[in-house]
Amino acid sequence: MAEDSVTILIVEDDDAYPSFGSLPASHAQYGFRLLRSIFLIMLVIWTAVWLKLLRDALL
């Protein structure tokens, strides 16, 4: 019955960000932070613009 057994391998990794090619994971981490920051800034800007347009339309 050994061929029916299942082995589960758990790998503990402190750095949850993947590495791309030869770049270390820290570079990927900063890239993700940068993209997330840009996305959040754009989200705030678009929200402010839409609120202004909505306010102007209702007044």
UniProtKB/Swiss-Prot annotation:
GO terms for cellular component: host cell membrane; membrane. It comes from the Viruses. InterPro entries: Herpes_UL2 (IPR013269). It is found in: Host membrane. Keywords: Host membrane, Membrane, Transmembrane, Transmembrane helix. It holds the Pfam family UL2. It is a single-pass membrane protein. The chain crosses the membrane at residues 32-54. Belongs to the HHV-5 UL2 protein family. This is Uncharacterized protein UL2. It comes from Human cytomegalovirus (strain Merlin) (HHV-5). The lineage of its organism: Viruses, Duplodnaviria, Heunggongvirae, Peploviricota, Herviviricetes.
